[in-house]
Amino acid sequence: MVEADRPGKLFIGGLNTETNEKALEAVFGKYGRIVEVLLMKDRETNKSRGFAFVTFESPADAKDAARDMNGKSLDGKAIKVEQATKPSFESGRRGLPPPPRSRGPPRGLRGGRGGSGGTRGPPSRGGHMDDGGYSMNFTMSSSRGPLPVKRGPPPRSGGPPPKRSAPSGPVRSSSGLGGRAPVSRGRDGYGGPPRREPLPSRRDVYLSPRDDGYSTKDSYSSREYPSSRDTRDYAPPPRDYTYRDYGHSSSRDDYPSRGYSDRDGYGRDRDYSDHPSGGSYRDSYESYGNSRSAPPTRGPPPSYGGSSRYDDYSSSRDGYGGSRDSYSSSRSDLYSSGRDRVGRQERGLPPSMERGYPPPRDSYSSSSRGAPRGGGRGGSRSDRGGGRSRY
């Protein structure tokens, strides 16, 4: 990195502190015309620091002087004479490191950004809905209050997707569950339509997220592992909640309609599983009164809900049409009408509505709440579904 200073400039080191510019000029002047003699002095004492720079007009003269004078004695001291080099701070070396540094941090930042983007990415992969779901959840959570924090960040990333998801949800409902979708709409209409609608939209989002459920789940788990865990504890309730509320309530219908077609029922189930695993949903649900009350019962289900439910879901998903279908249909239908309202209301959106629909809710809540999730659900499902067991 050392660069030679301008040609003709010599560094003279090891000088006697008594040697001055005139002496240097006298000694080196015999090699050629000297342009400058710079004796380095201490700022405070103004004494020679023992080295100087002599600049010759001709580089050739400088070379001769360096060759002849290097190691010679001047004023009793052997001096060192060589081509002057630029100080390291002037060489540009100093400049270079900063660029790397500046670059480095940006890289890190970029990486960080990329990472964050990546995290977002997966969810979006899962589906915008996932994000949407998150946002919805978050939204819901926010309505709940505590949950929002956990989900807060995701919502941002998910924020945009939610919008998409909501639309997608409706689309799904229109396509797959045209009938149901309308139903959900009706439900929405029914209790505090405005309130519900927001929920429904969220649900839609949820649905979509659930569809994306996997991704949601993944994203959730990855994103909100902690929350998922927390939610897991919660999860059970939320799940129930989800099932009940969502599944049963119009949301389920909505889900079914939306999530349904998209999920193929699969999504829905998965949504549920997602919820369980996601936990955020659970949390959200948890926030809901029902899930809260139910949590204890559901406590066990969480794990069960997560795995078995998943399985159930899977099976039901596969046989989703059949068992779940009936389940969902019975549930959704029963739920949709009663639970729908109840579920929505239960969610705590329209408490008044909730109260209005106590009966469905009771049955619904009793099934979900009273029994552990698995049991309750199974029971409720069978009740709802008729003989159909959960599966």
Swiss-Prot record:
The modification N-acetylvaline is found at V2. Residues 8-86 form the RRM domain. The keyword Nucleus applies. GO terms for cellular component: spliceosomal complex. GO terms for biological process: mRNA processing; RNA splicing. Residues 151-164 have a biased composition (Pro residues). Residues 62-80, 194-215, 241-274, 338-347, 380-391 have a biased composition (Basic and acidic residues). Induction: By high-fructose diet. O-glycosylated. The modification N-acetylmethionine is found at M1. The modification N6-acetyllysine is found at K30. The modification Phosphoserine is found at S88, S91, S165, S174, S261, S328, S329, S330, S332, S352. Residues 323-337, 362-371 have a biased composition (Low complexity). Residues 62-391 are annotated as: Disordered. Keywords: Acetylation, Activator, Glycoprotein, Isopeptide bond, Methylation, mRNA processing, mRNA splicing, Nucleus, Phosphoprotein, Repressor, Ribonucleoprotein, RNA-binding, Spliceosome, Transcription, Tumor suppressor, Ubl conjugation. Residues 216-225 have a biased composition (Polar residues). It is found in: Nucleus. Homomultimer. Found in the supraspliceosome complex. Identified in the spliceosome C complex. Interacts with KHDRBS3. Forms a complex with ILF2, ILF3, YLPM1, KHDRBS1, NCOA5 and PPP1CA Interacts with CLK2, KHDRBS2, SAFB, TRA2B and YTHDC1. Interacts with ERAP1; the interaction is RNA-independent. Interacts with SAFB/SAFB1. Interacts with PPIA/CYPA. The RRM domain is necessary for RNA-binding, but not for splice site selection, indicating that its splicing activity does not require direct binding to RNA. RNA-binding protein that plays several role in the regulation of pre- and post-transcriptional processes. Implicated in tissue-specific regulation of gene transcription and alternative splicing of several pre-mRNAs. Binds to and stimulates transcription from the tumor suppressor TXNIP gene promoter; may thus be involved in tumor suppression. When associated with SAFB, binds to and stimulates transcription from the SREBF1 promoter. Associates with nascent mRNAs transcribed by RNA polymerase II. Component of the supraspliceosome complex that regulates pre-mRNA alternative splice site selection. This is RNA-binding motif protein, X chromosome. It comes from Mus musculus (Mouse).
